[in-house]
Amino acid sequence: MRAVVQRISEGKVVVDDAVTGAIKKGLLVFLGVTKEDTMEDVQYMAEKIVNLRIFEDQEEKMNLSVKDVGGKILAVSQFTLLGDCRKGRRPSFTEAARPETADKLYEAFIEQCEKLDIKVEKGVFQAHMMVHLVNDGPVTMLIDSKKVF
């Protein structure tokens, strides 16, 4: 499971001119599910992201989590995070999970974050989405449950 996590001051997802999810201060999480992912990966990613200390404390040191600052998560499924661009010019998505599996694990990630007392808004799985955000910092982190990087 792979995520791009951005600290944002606000963000929203729009599908067919309707807002499907919107937050103020928090994290925008683009989540890609691999064909090898399990509930263990879901658990790892949810706990890592909810407790990731990338918000500044009073001394302007990154020392607070989204939970600590009372923020929310805006979760967006994005299979293109699994694109392999090492060969040729067209990405290969062979490592991405099948849609039915990816949807199940994406929803499980959201549920796990909510079990950790974080409010989660979301995009629409497999929809063409317009994602609007104001990146705070900017602060952007890459997280992989297999610890590839």
From Swiss-Prot:
Keyword Cytoplasm (UniProt): yes
Q: Where is this motif: Gly-cisPro motif, important for rejection of L-amino acids?
A: 137-138
* Primary localization: cytoplasm
Kindly give the CDD domains that the UniProt entry links to this protein.
Dtyr_deacylase
Q: Which reaction does it catalyse?
A: glycyl-tRNA(Ala) + H2O = tRNA(Ala) + glycine + H(+); a D-aminoacyl-tRNA + H2O = a tRNA + a D-alpha-amino acid + H(+)
User: Any idea of its EC number?
Assistant: 3.1.1.96
**Per the UniProt entry, what are the Gene Ontology biological process annotations, in alphabetical order?**
D-amino acid catabolic process
Query: What is said about its interaction partners and assembly?
Result: Homodimer.
Q: What is known of its domains?
A: A Gly-cisPro motif from one monomer fits into the active site of the other monomer to allow specific chiral rejection of L-amino acids.
Q: What is this protein called?
A: D-aminoacyl-tRNA deacylase
Query: What organism does the record attribute this protein to?
Result: Alkaliphilus oremlandii (strain OhILAs)
